[in-house]
Every structure is written in C-alpha cells, then in structure tokens.
Amino acid sequence: MALIRKTFYFLFAVFFILVQLPSGCQAGLDFSQPFPSGEFAVFESCKFSRGKCRKECLENEKPDGNCRLNFLCCRQSI
C-alpha cells in the first residue's frame, strides 16, 4: 500500500515538472509579431506605469530608458 502511494506521489510530481517545461510553441508575448500598421505590440508598462515597453517608439513618444534586452521604455512627448 505504501509503495503504491509513493509511486503515485512520484508520478504526480513528475507530471507537474513536465507541465512547467515549454512545449516548443512560441505563441507568447515575447514572440508576438508587429501589427499590420507597423506598430509593435505593447508588452508591459515601465517606470511605475509612466511608459510602455516597445521595440520602437511611436512618433509622439520619446525613449526614456530600457526595459529588457533591446526594448525601449517609450513615454508620451510633452
């Protein structure tokens, strides 16, 4: 009886470890493509929600620091 319970817990733990691994599908926000209009998708806010992390800033925005990798923190020009 104890062997069955230990086996069940082991398989249960292995299942949750395998679920956490990426499936190879690149359908997340990190891999999203630009919109048809040429604007890049907004990923997240930056600097206490004072801007948006983008690949390129829009015409009415100015770069104000970096977010991650090669993304810029874009703020509205005043």
Curated annotation (Swiss-Prot):
Keyword Disulfide bond tagged: yes
Record GO biological process: defense response to bacterium; innate immune response
Any Gene Ontology CC annotation: extracellular region
Primary residence: secreted
InterPro entries: Beta_defensin_dom
Domain of life where this protein originates: Eukaryota
Sequence similarity: Belongs to the beta-defensin family.
Protein name stated in the entry: Beta-defensin 105A
Alphabetized UniProt keyword annotations: Antibiotic, Antimicrobial, Defensin, Disulfide bond, Secreted, Signal
Cystine connections: 46-74, 53-67, 57-73
Pfam families registered for this protein in UniProt: Defensin_beta_2 (PF13841)
Signal peptide (residue range): 1-27
Keyword Signal annotated: yes
Cell compartments where the protein resides: Secreted
Biological role: Has antimicrobial activity.
